[in-house]
Amino acid sequence: MTENITKAVEYHKSGFSCSAAVLNAFRDEISISEIQAMSAAKPMAGGRMIKCGAVLAAEYVLRNKYDGDTAERKISEFEQEFTERNKSVVCRELKGIDTGKILRSCRGCVSDSAGILEKLIRDNV
């Protein structure tokens, strides 16, 4: 595991929401404080949105790190890879709320989001 994946998982283990865990692990990439990261993450957490909060947090980082077309391309790549791994980016589907079949745990989504995000940032093209 890379440092940012480890950080994200540790934040989640300590009680941070999925979105707060990912945003805090990568907050230095977009020059925001922990308070700003927690504030930005709050509306994304706990199934409040359709998409998984860990996915939304990663997209927030990409949107704030890159401009226009580059951000949109990286977000598209992120969603494609996350979906290939987990079959969905939709929180209800990942948690198996309607089907009873859990596709990925919240911690797994945090780890996957952090890993994919790290790769997209590292491959700065």
Whereabouts are the PLM-identified features?
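C-terminal binding/interaction regions
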Residues: 69, 76-125
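Buried hydrophobic packing segments
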Residues: 22-26, 57-65, 113-117
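Glycine/charged-rich beta-loop-alpha catalytic/anionic-binding loops adjacent to active sites
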Residues: 1-7, 36-43, 93-97
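Glycine/serine-rich anion-binding loops at beta->alpha junctions
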Residues: 44-60
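Phosphate-handling active-site elements
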Residues: 30-39, 62-77
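Acidic-glycine-rich active-site phosphate/pyrophosphate-binding loop
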Residues: 23-41, 83-91
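Short alpha-helical scaffolding segments that buttress acidic/His motifs in well-ordered protein cores
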Residues: 22, 40-45, 78, 113
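Active-site-proximal helix-loop elements at catalytic-domain edges
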Residues: 1-27
